[in-house]
Structure formats: C-alpha cells, structure tokens
Amino acid sequence: MRQTKTGILLANLGTPDAPTPEAVKRYLKQFLSDRRVVDTPRPLWWPLLRGVILPLRSPRVAKLYQSIWMDGGSPLMVYSREQQQGLAARLPDTPVALGMSYGSPSLESAVDELLASDVDHIVVLPLYPQYSCSTVGAVWDELGRILARKRRIPGISFIRDYADDGAYIDALAKSARESFARHGEPDLLLLSYHGIPQRYADEGDDYPQRCRDTTRELVSALGLPPEKVMMTFQSRFGREPWLTPYTDETLKMLGEKGTGHIQVMCPGFAADCLETLEEIAEQNREIFLEAGGKKYAYIPALNATPEHIDMMLKLTAPYR
C-alpha cells in the first residue's frame, strides 16, 4: 500500500507587495471585496468601495505601511516566511507552503506548490488562533474554490482554530513573562483582539467566545488576578457596531483614571503587522500617554519564536 505523503499549508491574511498607494489599493480592493469580510449588498458596496474607500484610504494606509516596512518586505510577510522556514527546518520530509487569502503568495499558489511536491494529503493551518467567519471562513471558502478547479484533489485536514490549545497558551504566557521581566509587572495587562461586527457574532460567529477562551486560559497560566487583565477589541471599520469594549477608547479611559503602567498583548495575531506595530504599538500608546498614563509597552506577537514553531508542530502532528 502506498504511503501517504503529507504537506502543510500555513495560511494568513496577506499584505500589500509594497508600501505604495497603488499596491495598497490592489490589496485593499481584493480584501474588501470578500463577502466574508464585508457582506454589504454589492450594489451598495461597489460604488462606496471604488469611489470613496479605495481612493481615500489607499494613500493614507500606504504611509502607515512605510513607517513599519522592513528590508525584507512587510513585517507580516517577513515573519510569515520565517515561520514557514522554521517549521520546514523541523520537518525535513514534509513540504511546508505559505499562502495568503489576499495578495501573494496566494492560497492557490501554495496548493499548487504542495501538489507539485506530489503530496496526497494537505494539513491546512490558518494562523488565526480564534475562529471567525471573516478569517478562517475566508480560507475555507477559497480552498474550496481552488480545489473545485483541480482534477486531483488531495485529502484535507483543516485546523479550525486553537484558541485554548496548551502549546499556544504556554507560548503566550512565556512571551508575557519575558515582557514583565523586561519592563516590570504592569498595573494592567490589556489583551487586544481584532474586532468583528457585532452582527456577525449575533448571527452565530463564535469568535467572541473563542477570545474569551484564550483570555481565560492565559490569565490562569500567568496566575494573574482577574482585575489585572482586560480584554478589548481593535481595528473597527465602518459605522455599524463592532465588538466592545474598543481598545482605543479603553486606553483613553484608563489613562484618564490614572492607570500608571499598561502592557498590551494581541493574542489573535500570529505575526506582527500593521495592526500591531502601528495601531497598537504607536497610535494607542499615544492615546494612553496623552490621557495621563505613565508607562506603556507592547508585547510582540509570537512571530517565528521557537515556542511558536513548537506549537505548529504539535498542532499538525495528529494529521501528519
């Protein structure tokens, strides 16, 4: 009997190819055209997207990307490649491909790369610790579209999420402890997750619960009293209500109340990106300090740390 050959597909959101208005516009157009991300009826959404959002946001967002761009590209791409290489180094007989929902390398190019390596089973690991229809669901949808065009369909193992996985929680806890050792233990640890529209949760997306699961397990692992930890949601977009409390408003309130020392971690981001390095580490830091806060530190994402690679090994092990 022929032995199954397995490959691993690491999936993430994506990034512009360059910190220019043109590249950002291409990326945002693809991202904001996905019904999993914005489900506004298309006759209403297309004119708004093409006539208002893309022309206005692309130059502004490009400037933000310029402030965090690295020699090897956007931080998300640099760290994602390091994750791919780190996992591949630990699994020399298992092909590991990287694919993005938007931009390049695409999910289709990752599937093609694995099929070219003659795999007949693919383990798909979306690097979103907490399931949401707008992230993990988008990977699932695109994977279905890709495979619908193939004559040869491999076996698929799809890891839905890992919000309360022990190796993931241990990696987060180690990162937090290292930050506490470097900056001192904070008055408050703020756990900021990417937001989604409240309506998505009302319609059945269990993302808020999965965020609560991560928070509960991390607080337990750190041994912190509940009053020293807060959970908030960032990066809201548009006018409809999103999950609350909002990170920026909470930081302003905490600064005004006289909270002295805050450290912020973003457990939902597997790799540092615009939303962590610019929005959290810079914009929200200014909000807190200008409101009266004294000390603010951002705890980096897990990126390609050995603990993060260990977690990927453990998550994929049952399917290899």
UniProtKB/Swiss-Prot annotation:
Give this protein's Gene Ontology molecular function annotations.
ferrochelatase activity; metal ion binding
Which keywords are on file for this protein?
Cytoplasm, Heme biosynthesis, Iron, Lyase, Metal-binding, Porphyrin biosynthesis
Q: What is its EC number?
A: 4.98.1.1
* Cellular component GO terms held in the UniProt record: cytoplasm
Major location, coarse class?
cytoplasm
Q: Which GO terms describe its biological process?
A: heme biosynthetic process
Chain positions recorded as Fe cation binding sites: H194, E275
PROSITE patterns in the cross-refs: FERROCHELATASE
The source's superkingdom equals Bacteria
Give the record's pathway.
Answer: Porphyrin-containing compound metabolism; protoheme biosynthesis; protoheme from protoporphyrin-IX: step 1/1
Query: Is this entry keyworded Iron?
Result: yes
Catalyzed reactions per annotation: heme b + 2 H(+) = protoporphyrin IX + Fe(2+)
**Function noted in UniProt:** Catalyzes the ferrous insertion into protoporphyrin IX.
Which family is annotated?
Belongs to the ferrochelatase family.
Q: What is this protein called?
A: Ferrochelatase
The scientific name of the source species is Salmonella arizonae (strain ATCC BAA-731 / CDC346-86 / RSK2980)
Q: What is the lineage of its organism?
A: Bacteria, Pseudomonadati, Pseudomonadota, Gammaproteobacteria, Enterobacterales
